[in-house]
Amino acid sequence: MTNYAIVKASGRQLWFEPGKYYNINYVHANPGDKIIFYKVLLLKNTNSLLIGKPFVEKVEVHATILQHLKDKKITVFKMQAKKGTKKKKGYKTVLTKIKINCIHNHKK
């Protein structure tokens, strides 16, 4: 059984496992910086399951920022029928690649 945590980060609920890499919405920090997620909604260890109300207390997820990157381009096309108006726009979402170092449970 693997350890994992469900964390509220960058406006979403994300499933984190130690030692894995994830792309999340942009975090204002430099590559190489360490970040800590405190808003843990659920923690699963080998022998226990902790569910928060709404967050699990004294649990934190430690991660390292590896790099900032852009996602694939999303194209938005607007058109008004019978008017001849067309607009084509596109954007690339800026993401941050992180590595989950460990999940600390200070409740033990």
Swiss-Prot record:
Record's keyword terms, sorted: Chloroplast, Plastid, Ribonucleoprotein, Ribosomal protein, RNA-binding, rRNA-binding
SUPFAM superfamilies given in the database record: L21p-like (SSF141091)
S-S bridge residues: none
Segments crossing the lipid bilayer: none
GO cellular component annotations of the record: chloroplast; mitochondrial large ribosomal subunit
Gene Ontology molecular-function annotations: rRNA binding; structural constituent of ribosome
GO annotation (BP), single: translation
Superkingdom per UniProt: Eukaryota
InterPro entries: bL21-like, bL21-like_sf, Ribosomal_bL21, Ribosomal_bL21_CS
Compartment(s) of residence: Plastid, Chloroplast
Chief location: plastid
Quaternary state and interactors: Part of the 50S ribosomal subunit.
Family: Belongs to the bacterial ribosomal protein bL21 family.
Function, as annotated: This protein binds to 23S rRNA.
Protein name, UniProt field: Large ribosomal subunit protein bL21c
UniProt source species: Cyanidium caldarium (Red alga)
